[in-house]
A protein has these predicted regions:
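Extended, Lys/Arg-enriched charged tracts that mediate electrostatic binding to polyanionic substrates
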Residues: 33-57, 115-160, 164
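A short, charged
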Residues: 103-135, 190-195, 199-206
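Residues that form generic nucleotide/phosphate-binding pockets
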Residues: 3, 14, 18-21, 57-61, ...
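Short, solvent-exposed helix-helix connector turns and helix-capping sites enriched
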Residues: 7, 49, 204-205
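P-loop NTPase catalytic core of nucleic-acid-dependent motor ATPases
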Residues: 65-90, 112, 147-148, 153-154, ...
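Alpha-helix initiation and N-capping motif
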Residues: 8, 12, 51-55, 88-92, ...
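Basic chromatin DNA-binding modules
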Residues: 54-68
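Modules that initiate DNA replication and primer synthesis
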Residues: 1-40, 68-107
């Protein structure tokens, strides 16, 4: 039988509460790139009943936020760089939130009557979460050699500096950095103190 109350209004309210709870931990919980509504609800509802379908839904909701390769395992986009730290926990939260979003999509007034199979299939549990994540790994595969390969680019707190031109570039997941300098780049900052240090350390001729 149905595991949820028969009143769709009550169910949606309960699911919204669960979705909020799913987002509060761990600290590095990713934000969905789309909020469930309209076409996205349709995608989540009609994706199918398989681990692959759940993986496709995670990939749609969290596009560009996770990568996988055999050397590093799971990587998570922090907004400035890719990191292994907390990546698996962040992925678990993203997967649980996706499953709850699929249940929510199957609990709308227009989908509630026929949505029982989706609601039952997408109940978050260890097997369902791990199955989706296993299938997701091949959708977001990367190669270890893709990372930190740009010697002329420096990743700073407020963007990426092109050392050849001094131009500041916005952070982007396509930039495969696994580090981020804790300081911001200031284009107009004076280098006088740094030059003075070099001159004192190695001599004016070598510093020049």
């Amino acid at each position: 039988g149905e595991l949820y109350p028969t009143n769709p209004t009550n169910l949606v309210g309960e699911l919204q509460s669960l979705l909020e709870q799913a987002k509060v931990e761990p600290p590095q919980t990713p934000a969905a790139s789309e909020q469930p509504s309209g076409d996205l609800y349709k995608f989540l509802y009609t994706a199918g009943l398989s681990d692959e379908a759940n993986a496709q839904c995670v990939n749609r909701l969290y596009q560009g936020q996770f990568l996988y390769n055999d050397a590093f395992g799971w990587l998570f986009w922090t907004g400035s760089h890719w990191t292994k730290e907390g990546a698996e926990a962040a992925l678990d939260r993203a997967t649980v939130t996706t499953l709850l979003s699929r249940i929510e999509a199957a609990s709308q007034p227009e989908t509630f009557e026929e949505g029982g199979k989706v609601r039952r299939f997408c109940l978050p549990n260890k097997g369902r979460v791990q199955g989706a994540e296993h299938m997701l790994s091949s959708l977001v595969i990367s190669q270890p050699g893709e990372f930190d390969t740009e010697p002329d680019l420096l990743n700073c707190g407020n963007g990426v500096v092109d050392l050849r031109s001094g131009k500041l570039i916005a952070h982007d997941p396509g930039q495969r950095f696994t580090y981020c300098s804790p300081v911001d780049y200031k284009p107009g900052a004076s280098s006088e103190q740094w030059v003075s240090f070099l001159e004192a350390a190695v001599g004016a001729e070598q510093a020049a």
